[in-house]
Amino acid sequence: MANQKIRIRLKAYDYALIDRSAQEIVETAKRTGAVVKGPIPLPTKIERFNILRSPHVNKTSREQLEIRTHLRLMDIVDWTDKTTDALMKLDLSAGVDVEIKVQ
């Protein structure tokens, strides 16, 4: 479509899953003749939690946990209806959150 692009944002806790899914999207889009910009790795969001190890005493003894959220961004330019059909039929991993916007 003219002057429109599809922006795809991927979010996952495992970097291997997100890279594999991004590669599948790029291959599918290029197979239909679209131009793909990306995947661009965005900064990893790190959430840290401190939890008491003991339920009663020893407040100084704590467990430190963290969750890392990995993000990737892709733009698909010069896409056709074939591209959208192929992307809709694409089956990605369950651990990857996909957000698609047409701009």
From Swiss-Prot:
Signal peptide span: none
Disulfide-bonded cysteines: none
UniProt keyword terms in alphabetical order: Ribonucleoprotein, Ribosomal protein
SUPFAM superfamilies xrefs: Ribosomal protein S10
GO molecular function, one term: tRNA binding
Any single Pfam family the record assigns to this protein: Ribosomal_S10
GO terms under cellular component: ribonucleoprotein complex; ribosome
Subunit structure, as described in the record: Part of the 30S ribosomal subunit.
Name the UniProt record assigns to this protein: Small ribosomal subunit protein uS10
Organism: Neisseria meningitidis serogroup C / serotype 2a (strain ATCC 700532 / DSM 15464 / FAM18)
Taxonomic lineage of the native organism: Bacteria, Pseudomonadati, Pseudomonadota, Betaproteobacteria, Neisseriales
Encoding gene per record: rpsJ
